């Protein structure tokens, strides 16, 4: 079992390339920050990433996020999805949670952007320059998701409208991602 075999097998690479091509032929980036998505929030994440001593500073972040989701009336799914299903789910979701992994960043931020899904991240000053001009929802703490009367869905809907105005409207054009 090797990293190369797991992530770069010919079959997996071809499936992912076909999926990317199909998704990008559907509609221009940012045209879908709204009404055509099937689900509001993709919540699948595990705790194992932050168990490493290398990332002690992020320990507890994902557990805290899970508690916030529960209090805000959201269901958290922690199931592992095959890569194709994972990409399709990102493409069908308006937002996805991208808690820190082995660093303040997460691969999910970039995967989400690639599939027209808005990543929800913890605001981290050194990364603001990376996110400038991108539809990334940076929150000061996970508790901010509860600021609309304790309802995560209402908070995200309000932010979706703001982000659509900024990134999906005529002012920015269709190619904003």
Regions found by a protein language model. Name each.
Residues 1-110, 114-137, 156, 162-177:
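Nucleotide-sugar donor-binding catalytic core of glycosyltransferases
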Residues 150-156:
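Short, C-terminally biased terminal segments at protein or domain edges
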């Amino acid at each position: 079992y090797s990293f190369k075999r797991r992530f770069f097998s010919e079959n997996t690479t071809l499936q992912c390339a076909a999926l990317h091509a199909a998704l990008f032929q559907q509609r221009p980036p940012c045209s879908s920050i709204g009404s055509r998505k099937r689900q509001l929030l993709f919540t699948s994440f595990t705790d194992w990433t932050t168990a490493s001593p290398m990332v002690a500073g992020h320990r507890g972040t994902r557990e805290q996020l899970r508690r916030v989701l529960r209090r805000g009336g959201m269901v958290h799914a922690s199931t592992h999805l095959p890569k194709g299903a994972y990409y399709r789910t990102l493409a069908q979701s308006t937002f996805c949670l991208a808690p820190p992994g082995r660093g303040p960043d997460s691969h999910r931020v970039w995967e989400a952007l690639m599939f027209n899904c808005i990543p929800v991240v913890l605001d981290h000053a050194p990364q603001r320059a990376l996110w400038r001009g991108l539809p990334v929802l940076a929150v000061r703490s996970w508790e901010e998701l509860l600021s609309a009367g304790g309802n995560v869905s209402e908070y995200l809907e309000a932010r979706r409208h703001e982000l659509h105005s900024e990134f999906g409207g005529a002012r920015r054009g269709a190619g904003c991602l």
